[in-house]
Amino acid sequence: GFSIGVLLIKDEPTQQNTDKLDLTTTSAMRWLLDKAANVEEAITMLENMDMHASANASHHFQMADAQGNSAVIEYIDNELRVIRKEPDGLQYLTNFLISEDVYGFGKGQDRYEILENTLTQNHGILSEMESMDLLQAVSQDKISEDTGKQTATQWSVVYNNTKKTAKI
């Protein structure tokens, strides 16, 4: 099993322009879900395509597979970056960049800290219900102080890559 999630970053949209396959954020996710069996295959596929961000923003992705591999994909200045999970480590993500040279750009550091604390305390092992409760605890549904616009989590899903199930 393989799963992928996407999170919005308020930044210039990624627009790669080479001679590779052109895909948007959502079509790339669909392509990866249809064709990639694991994280390494997905990374190879992304390296061989040009990303064109949807929603006039930038995005980063977190992907995982049934073998316990996980990676975050970020596009910085239209260049693909891969941040792999450390062996025996945990990986989690909110709406700010985690690439070392731009770490912290964006929002959601408070929600990231909740993820970090909860997952660390539980050694990364949560039931489906506990996982959904954690996603609810870090979801957004508020009016932005910066723009006056509503900021909301669009969906939350708990994936079990071993059983190949998803809980909404």
Predicted features and spans:
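Beta-strand-turn-beta hairpins that frame and shape the catalytic cleft
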Residues: 1-3
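C-terminal, well-structured catalytic/ligand-binding subdomain of enzymes
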Residues: 5-34, 57-59, 64-168
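Short N-terminal edge-element motif at the start of the domain
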Residues: 33-36, 41-51
